[in-house]
């Protein structure tokens, strides 16, 4: 808060404008009105003043309110004593003083309807106006104060030589540099280097304003005291008042019995009220003692001390606390403390007290250098909750450590670290984290990588492991290490491109075979074999660890023209495996070898597969019009031929491979599998066409794509345990029709859809449709409506150790946890944030699973938002995941909660910060809405 009074120099050399200040010695003190005399400097250095006309022809002197002169030594008149006393700011109950101006213009307040377009763009959507600093001379002056002259302007002036008192009256303005003081009347005491301002006092400086009845200014230091004061910080939308405001020489402002709020002048929705409030513009923070948080002038919270921001700068201190209550934690209070250690690094401590669990200490350290950025974090809790005491892998000494880092040792060598470790797999299910970048997935990442970027190649050394954060999944493979080199040769003889991909990687995991107990200490028979880990369901060569070496050189000949392109390409993929398998896996592999879709174990396997493709396309366009709008319509046919011979790959385990889902883009891929462990055999011709409607300004109004693949042979290469003869789509002569349609009503409305229809079964294979509305000029309005259907999912069932195709079941028929079509997707999702009356919005979301006839999430509530505070009240139902069983469906249980969020703008969230997370995740457009809000 750069709140400063004019720091006039010791002898205050004055440039007098609009009035006359007599500084030369006179026999007697008298008043001279500038509008009645012409004055010039005489030869002796004094003033030579001549009347404009004979004195006896002067009209009677008019009486001007606010321009009458009084001597600094004269006693107050009886009339002054009987005048009404000014209204005190303490009587305003947090509002601006209407006695100073009915429309609060004395605080530079401008109603919303009077703001310019540029000012509206900088004003929050629910603010009734803004504090606009008026343009004035010198407001952008950056001249040092000790080098700046002082300008004084007044209607009339008087100087008493013997007392060395200068008196100014009528629209008094004193300015030095960027600072300006205004008043009805001023007395300047030259001998004491101080001044007195009386009546409608205003002191301005660099985006701040202090208004009062009287002020005392020390002219040589700039120290000042303003009585019955109101203050405003224009850009921060901050205002307040005090019995008096003191400005020290170093520009620190101290308020006696002061207030602080971001509410509009006519509102007392909330305010901080303290005996002593200090605002430090040098640090950008304020402090207050004996503070009460008042809502509608009713005290709701007390603290003996508080530390708060007055601008956007960082500073060490307590952040706004948050509290909540849940069944897992009980009442929870978080009191973060921020450490502003340096401009490029900081730290935050999050003490989190939970009545059911104890005190969780969590902290993070962030850093930023010229070549890197990242954060270190950790947490510790001695958990006194014993609900999981008997459950496998539970630890009551709970902890988490993490490190995220991205940087470059030079312009070519890049470094990356994403490492998280936790004490037990239930950490994120039971506890929350306030650290940035920490995600609660089924596994936590433990990765470090070095990347070298050459002129024509990229080399990468990667080490990646995973820590389990659930019991209901199979232990994944670690890559320890992985080396890749991908690039292109720097020369192109005859227009040919030569590229290559190489990889050497070690896959390793430690499958567990111990018993699993539930929270009661009983064996968990829900999913594992005989109460053992789910890892025991992994069988045969799927249990193998090993090394994989892959080399894939390619040669292509791109031929391009303005009307189209043709690119033939030949790639050769060579892969070598060195495998090791435990005794259990070898026995199971022997038994499985006779079954379709399974292979036998070999410690060394090599595979080489050629891949030939020809990608081609044409481009046509024409000018057209639709509904009175001119467009350029394009027509872009595409043809893609792919030939890959069949290679038996059933002896190869899956380390990082799965089958991709069918869509329009998959028509033009050279492998229907992700990863390297499977290369799909193909002999197909894909045909597709895309058309676009593009406006004259380049805006793409809509586009439509349709395509289909023609197969000339069956697709025999499959995932383990899957026989291509049992898959109709592996034997079909044609692929499903793939359609994509996108329509952009304008830059605010859009409709995105895709549809895949199987002509063999005459049924929908998959599809989705999503409508999104969010006006660019009013992003507070959000509407989302979507539907998605997929009956061709390919998933690994951890309870059986097999792959399921086509929306498969969970478990086997007859099992207690069997669920038919568990992996099939058929859902709708509707969400809306919509203003119903000014400052009131409705918030709702409904996500429903038709396949299992259940609601995944439903919430509804309202939001009140204005310029200084926000309130949200939301009733929410959702499917929660609490890992008490190895059977994933048993861990899915409905939960319900009523969430209240209160945000005091300028202080932060007081309660209910968790609301932000599920609104951000559940409603598309919510983050954009919040980013533009004040």
From Swiss-Prot:
A GO BP term, please? Gram-negative-bacterium-type cell outer membrane assembly
Q: Gene3D superfamilies from the entry?
A: Lipopolysaccharide (LPS) transport protein A like domain
Keywords of the record: Cell outer membrane, Membrane, Signal
| InterPro entries for the chain | LipoPS_assembly_LptD, LptD, LptD_C, OstA-like_N
Signal peptide extent: 1-33
Q: Which domain of life is it from?
A: Bacteria
The entry's localization annotation reads: Cell outer membrane
Main location (coarse class): membrane
Q: What does this protein do?
A: Together with LptE, is involved in the assembly of lipopolysaccharide (LPS) at the surface of the outer membrane.
Subunit architecture: Component of the lipopolysaccharide transport and assembly complex. Interacts with LptE and LptA.
Q: What is this protein called?
A: LPS-assembly protein LptD
Which gene name does the record give? lptD
